[in-house]
Amino acid sequence: MALKPLGDRIVVHFEETEEKTASGFVLAGASHEATKTAEVLAVGEGIRTLTGELIALSVAAGDKVLVENGAGVNVKDGDDSVSIIREADILAVLA
């Protein structure tokens, strides 16, 4: 991975989902859902308080998370398509 996120940013890879209608048409899975599942690939160091104390992020590389649909920015990392989101965009860590 060539991307190293800064601050409270997190690099994730969204799981691709597709649905088919009864007649076989493929629908874009994430287009109508409110949330998406993603795997955390890399995390920033965290955020600093006004006093300079570093607060680490609550997730780590390898975690599966539930993210708001439409959150973040899509970028290319070599041949891979990943997204950079903020920790606040994560709704839950999946167990």
Swiss-Prot record:
User: Is Transferase set as a keyword in this record?
Assistant: no
> Which GO cellular component terms are attached?
cytoplasm
Q: What is its main location?
A: cytoplasm
Key word Cytoplasm present in the record? yes
InterPro entries, per this entry?
Chaperonin_GroES, Chaperonin_GroES_sf, GroES-like_sf
GO biological process, alphabetically ordered: chaperone cofactor-dependent protein refolding
Domain of life, per UniProt, equals: Bacteria
Q: Where in the cell is it found?
A: Cytoplasm
User: What GO annotations for molecular function exist for this entry?
Assistant: ATP binding; metal ion binding; protein folding chaperone; protein-folding chaperone binding; unfolded protein binding
* Name of a matching Pfam family: Cpn10
* Cross-referenced SMART domains: Cpn10
What keywords is this UniProt entry annotated with? Chaperone, Cytoplasm
Q: What's the subunit arrangement here?
A: Heptamer of 7 subunits arranged in a ring. Interacts with the chaperonin GroEL.
User: Family per UniProt?
Assistant: Belongs to the GroES chaperonin family.
Q: What does this protein do?
A: Together with the chaperonin GroEL, plays an essential role in assisting protein folding. The GroEL-GroES system forms a nano-cage that allows encapsulation of the non-native substrate proteins and provides a physical environment optimized to promote and accelerate protein folding. GroES binds to the apical surface of the GroEL ring, thereby capping the opening of the GroEL channel.
User: What protein name applies here?
Assistant: Co-chaperonin GroES
Q: Which organism is it from?
A: Streptococcus salivarius
